[in-house]
C-alpha cells in the first residue's frame, strides 16, 4: 500500500530539525514600471492546490467551499457561477466550456457554464486539478492512478495504474496536454500517454532522486508544468528542474536544485525558487544559469509567472513582486490582503490575476 506525505508534514519535519529563518525584510524600492490594481473579488477561501485557468478573456477559479466561477478578465464581471455541492480537494480544470473540480468526498464534478452535468466517484484522494481537453476529463489521484472520463456523460473510458513508489506526495502534480498526447507525472518521470486508450507512449526522468530514505528520495513532479513549444519543463520535488522535448521524448536539460513550488517561464527563460526562496533563472534552450536573486529568501514564494520584461511572484504576506527578467531586480511591488498568495499568478490579455489563501482575487495591470 502506498503512503502519502503532504507539504505540511514535510514542513513540520524541517521545523523540528532547525528553525526556519525569518523572511528577508523587504527592501525599499523606487518603482521602475507602472502598475495598479484594476479590480478585486472574493471567494470563500482558495481551493487546495488551486490552478487558475485563463481562456478567451475569462478567469475561472474555485473556492474551498465548492464554488466555481468565471470572471471577465478586463473588469472582473461575473460571467457564471456554480457549486460542486461539497468542499474541494483540487481544482480547477477548464476548456472554456466545461470546468472540473474534485471534492473531499472523492468525486470529480463537471460543470458547464455553472450547471453541474455529472459526478463520478474516485477510488483515491486527488490533489491535482483535473485536465479538461478533447471532450475528455483526466484525473490523477495522489496514488498516481490516472482516470479518463467522457466530458459529455461522465463515462469512465480508461484507467492507467502502474507500479510505483511506496511513498507519494500529496501536492498538485503534472497533468497536461501536448498536441495529441496526455502528459502526466509518475514520480520524477514525465510520462506520455495515448489519451484515447490510456497506453504509455514514452517516459523520461526529469531528475535523479537522491537520499538515504523514502522521504529524501521523494521526487514527484510538481505542477503545473511549463510548456515552451515542443519542450515541457517541470520541477521534481526537492530534487531538480528539468525540460524534455515532448515531441521526441528526449531530455533537453536537467539541473539539481531543491524546491517545492512549480516553475514558470517563456521561450527564453525558465524561473523558479528553491526551498529557501532563492530565485534562479535558466536559459530555456540550454539550462545555463542566467541569474540568481536572494532578495526574497524565506518569504514563502508562489510559483512564478513570466510575462513581458517581468517575473512575477507572490509571497506569504500577500505581496506581489514584479522582478526584472534580465537580472532579478525588483521593478514594482503591490499588496493584496496580507494572506499568502496560493497559486501562480495567471494572465489573460494584459490583466494579471493573483489569488490569496483568504479567497481574495486581485487583478493587476502593469502599464
Language-model-detected regions and their locations in the chain:
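Short loop/turn segments that connect beta-strands within beta-propeller blades
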Residues: 72-75, 112-115, 150-153, 195-198, ...
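Blade-level signature of beta-propeller repeat domains, shared across WD40, Kelch, NHL, RCC1
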Residues: 330, 335-367
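C-terminal motif of bacterial Sec signal peptides marking the signal peptidase cleavage site
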Residues: 12-15
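Structural signature of WD-repeat beta-propellers
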Residues: 63-64, 103-104, 141-142, 185-187, ...
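Extracytoplasmic beta-rich repeat domains
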Residues: 20-53, 80-96, 117-133, 156-179, ...
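Loop/turn-rich, solvent-exposed surfaces of beta-rich toroidal or solenoidal domains
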Residues: 273-280, 288-322
Amino acid at each position: 500500500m502506498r503512503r502519502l506525505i503532504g507539504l505540511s508534514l514535510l514542513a513540520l519535519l524541517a521545523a523540528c530539525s532547525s528553525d526556519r529563518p525569518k523572511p528577508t525584510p523587504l527592501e525599499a524600492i523606487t518603482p521602475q514600471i507602472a502598475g495598479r490594481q484594476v479590480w478585486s473579488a472574493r471567494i470563500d477561501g482558495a481551493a487546495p492546490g488551486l490552478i487558475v485557468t485563463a481562456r478567451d478573456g475569462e478567469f475561472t477559479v474555485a473556492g474551498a467551499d465548492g464554488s466555481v466561477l468565471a470572471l471577465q478578465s478586463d473588469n472582473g464581471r461575473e460571467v457564471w457561477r456554480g457549486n460542486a455541492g461539497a468542499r474541494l480537494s483540487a481544482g480547477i480544470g477548464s476548456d472554456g466550456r466545461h470546468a472540473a473540480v474534485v471534492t473531499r468526498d472523492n468525486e470529480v464534478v463537471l460543470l458547464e457554464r455553472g450547471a453541474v452535468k455529472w459526478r463520478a466517484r474516485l477510488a483515491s484522494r486527488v490533489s491535482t486539478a483535473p485536465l479538461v481537453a478533447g471532450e475528455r476529463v483526466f484525473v490523477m489521484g495522489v496514488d498516481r492512478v490516472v482516470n479518463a472520463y467522457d466530458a459529455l456523460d461522465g463515462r469512465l473510458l480508461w484507467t492507467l495504474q502502474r507500479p510505483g513508489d511506496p511513498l507519494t506526495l500529496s501536492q498538485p502534480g503534472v497533468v497536461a496536454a501536448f498536441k495529441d498526447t496526455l502528459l502526466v507525472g509518475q514520480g520524477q518521470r514525465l510520462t506520455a500517454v495515448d489519451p484515447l486508450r490510456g497506453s504509455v507512449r514514452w517516459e523520461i526522468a526529469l531528475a535523479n532522486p537522491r537520499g538515504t530514505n523514502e522521504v529524501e528520495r521523494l521526487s514527484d513532479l510538481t505542477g503545473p508544468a511549463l510548456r515552451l513549444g515542443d519542450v515541457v519543463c517541470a520541477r521534481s520535488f526537492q530534487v531538480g528542474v528539468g525540460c524534455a522535448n515532448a515531441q521526441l521524448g528526449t531530455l533537453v536539460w536537467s539541473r539539481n536544485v531543491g524546491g517545492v513550488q512549480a516553475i514558470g517561464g517563456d521561450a527564453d527563460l525558465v524561473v523558479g525558487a528553491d526551498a529557501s526562496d532563492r530565485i534562479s533563472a535558466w536559459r530555456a534552450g540550454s539550462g545555463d544559469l542566467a541569474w540568481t536573486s536572494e532578495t526574497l529568501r524565506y518569504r514563502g514564494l508562489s510559483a512564478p509567472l513570466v510575462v513581458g520584461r517581468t517575473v512575477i511572484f507572490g509571497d506569504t504576506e500577500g505581496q506581489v513582486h514584479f522582478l526584472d527578467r534580465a537580472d532579478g531586480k525588483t521593478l514594482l511591488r503591490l499588496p493584496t490582503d496580507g494572506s499568502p498568495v496560493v497559486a501562480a499568478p495567471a494572465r489573460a490579455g494584459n490583466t494579471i490575476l493573483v489569488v490569496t489563501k483568504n479567497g481574495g482575487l486581485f487583478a493587476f495591470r502593469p502599464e
